[in-house]
Amino acid sequence: MIIYLHGFDSNSPGNHEKVMQLQFIDPDVRLISYSTRHPKHDMQHLLKEVDKMLQLTADDRPLICGVGLGGYWAERIGFLCDIRQAVFNPNLFPHENMEGKIDRPEEYADIATKCVTNFREKNRDRCLVVLSRQDEALDSQRSADLLHHYYEIIWDEEQTHKFKNISPHLQRLKAFKTLG
């Protein structure tokens, strides 16, 4: 089972395309929708929904995957639910760059202070990070500088922030998922 979390643009047709691409790895791909506008509510909702899906699956090696803001959540929810994560261009600083787009961006900073101390150290090697050198929305190098101590980083030379085509990375994702 692969759980897919969309980014800030929840209505983008690219979400369906990514789900279709992920089905080449595992036919059981489940998209969880969330508001993107209310971080504390989103966290509770995502934890509940992911836990429910994990209770109902026979897959002993599930994967949670997210793009952009979905990558932010996939890393944290995956850690809390003890499943591997794959993130594409994760928005690691939504409290800085979501100003004016969501109601309470400061809630992201609050969530970070309430998260497990050094959670990335405890999550070491359980998240695969794919960053685009062409990301027009986020500073990919800043993300790499923060994450490379803990996770494998794969650089993509062609995709933009929304990462429409993940297919060049599917075999690596599949191998990562099978590690459990």
From Swiss-Prot:
Superkingdom assignment: Bacteria
Pfam families: UPF0227 (PF05728)
Listed InterPro entries: AB_hydrolase_fold (IPR029058), UPF0227 (IPR022987), UPF0227/Esterase_YqiA (IPR008886)
Family: Belongs to the UPF0227 family.
This protein's name: UPF0227 protein KPN78578_10770
Organismal lineage: Bacteria, Pseudomonadati, Pseudomonadota, Gammaproteobacteria, Enterobacterales
